[in-house]
Amino acid sequence: MDRKMVESLFQRASTLKCLVVGDLMLDEYLWGRTDRISPEAPVQVVDVLREDLRLGGAGNVANNLLALGCQVTVASVIGEDENGWALLKAFSRQGVDTAPIYQEPGRRTGRKTRVIAANQQIVRIDRESREPLSGQIEQQLINWLQQHITGFDVVLVSDYLKGVLTPSVLASVTSTASRRNIPVLVDPKGSDYSKYRGATCLTPNRKEAEAASGVPIQDGASLQQAADTIMSTVGLDNLLITRSEEGMSLFCGNGETVHIPTVAREVFDVTGAGDTVLALLACGLAGGLPLAESARLANVAAGIAVAKLGTSTVTPAEIIAAVSLEHRDSDSKIKNREVLSEIIAAERAKGRQVVFTNGCFDLLHAGHVKYLQAARRLGDLLILGLNSDASVRRLKGPKRPLIDEDERGHLMAALDCIDYVCLFEEDTPLELITALKPQILVKGGDYTPEGVVGKDLVESYGGRVELIPFVDGKSTTNIIEKVLERYTDEQ
């Protein structure tokens, strides 16, 4: 994917109006440890250390859109119970329009409780309602949809078969949206996809596609057969089948098929990955990307989501970083302070050790390279803070730098040992270190630990300072003197 195209999309995200229609629920997580078996039965005993509640179902789709910066409205029906009020409160805190979330007396708001120990889900407990909506509440929802859908750029339908998406509600969504050429994207459930007729694109996973088509997917031919069956049955123009470690396959009504390979990642939890796919596909389409590019974007985001435990969101910074890794050119490694702060925070959350060093690096030489390679070996990521031209002039004098900041930045970013480069205008890198919070701060051997800018800050949160000796006789000053000496002799 083109990184600049993705960055441009996310810059426009705050203008995109997204409507999410579907089943809402709460996802409860009980995090703990287990090291014994119950004397009452052959089951593990979990000591709960932490509990948290997250928006689930269509709520996780909304959360993903919010994380991208989109404007979000949610239309659904919940109960007049504790879980229902908790959902409304959570949405309100995030600025979500909850006007079309109706509460039905006697209806049970869904809550899924997952018990997790040692990064493994041990058991899930579901408390939910699967009854279709009553006639009165169904009509209220339909009336709102018919009156307001035209104000949105895209509609996302998140079906968990919990009763909100009745045939009448679905027909109202697709018919109203299609009259205004508003795309409708559906994450489907069940085996009867005819209820989604009129949608722009469905996004089943492989298992769901097998159930809907009756075709076991074992190879490329059976995959195509399953897609053809679903598309002809539903009268569908576009179908995106997610295939886990095999990526995604987009089938279009014009006969075009796009297979999108996955990026190899460690998978911790597939919970909510389909919600992430739906959200990114919608963001891309609403933002003007072609469907195939939107699918590629969704594929990148899904790869990030499955590396996290539980229902989770993916940020623009994480997606841009992942896209940049696909095309690891020097441009993709040069980041401003704000974007890099988000990237580094995400890397720290994964337990990765971030190393930071800084300097002018005017006239790159072998001593620099060996120093930077040694710094990179101290952790998982090496961030280089690079003095701007103005900063170099204040430190080195009016004749420096010899190489301007743009060229220096690209030269440094071209080194494999450097993961990201960030220019700073100040005389010292203290503000940049404060923003990035690296665990390891590196300087050359001509420093003492006490003389390293940022030492106290890094050590205050458990980090450390490392000093790496310079290579004797290798310096920018020596190079300049040698050039002047040789060219002076020639003249």
Curated annotation (Swiss-Prot):
Gene that specifies this protein: hldE
Protein keywords: ATP-binding, Carbohydrate metabolism, Kinase, Multifunctional enzyme, Nucleotide-binding, Nucleotidyltransferase, Transferase
Keyword flag Electron transport: no
Positions of the UniProt region annotated as Cytidylyltransferase: 356-491
Keyword Nucleotide-binding included in the entry's annotation: yes
GO cellular component, one term: cytosol
Family per record: In the N-terminal section; belongs to the carbohydrate kinase PfkB family.
Protein name: Bifunctional protein HldE
The organism's place on the tree of life at top rank: Bacteria
Subunit structure: Homodimer.
Region Ribokinase, annotated ranges: 1-330
An example Gene Ontology biological process: ADP-L-glycero-beta-D-manno-heptose biosynthetic process
